[in-house]
């Protein structure tokens, strides 16, 4: 049963680990690049569906810091796809009221990618229907470590202030639900601070297969859970012992 602390009327923050592009392609005798291209199509579908399903913030794990270890050709292809997405989706994002933010390091990205990110963020800055956050060259542990280094120079610190140092944004809602596709069951260094009390949903579906129905299924499971945030399970009236029976 859903806790009052997260009602259905609230706009949720959902994070998705988009996993399984390569395996989806390999099983079909296709190149891994074709799998990543299909994954971009899924991003379009989910970005469109998210606001209709009560999501206000959507964080997508696109490229981790550890992904630099992949073959250079695959990394180059992923960067090309990212540049293509940024260049071709901005107009649609603006039209649909989507604000885009890219989180993670930018100093190691090709100049063309970094510039495309800046242009896309500026163009979509006033979107209010959905906040789309794409994690590129991202590591949650690095984000926490960098925040701690900045916090060391402060004389006082609140949890809210530290959260802003970690996320780079004031007032960002903590993550309510993290979804991972492909059947893997781990967080892979994703949203470790802001997802401290996130519910987890793992699906066998590969990312290119994931659709609005799968998203709705994950959200239905989420709304069926009781979020305790460290507290105790709610006790139903019939479970409370009567003094007359004590």
Swiss-Prot record:
It holds the Pfam family Prenyltransf. Substrate binds at residues 20-24, 32, 36, 64-66, 68, 70, 180, 186-188. GO terms for molecular function: ditrans,polycis-undecaprenyl-diphosphate synthase [(2E,6E)-farnesyl-diphosphate specific] activity; magnesium ion binding. Binds 2 magnesium ions per subunit. PROSITE patterns: UPP_SYNTHASE. The keyword Magnesium applies. The keyword Metal-binding applies. Catalyzes the condensation of isopentenyl diphosphate (IPP) with allylic pyrophosphates generating different type of terpenoids. This is Isoprenyl transferase 1.
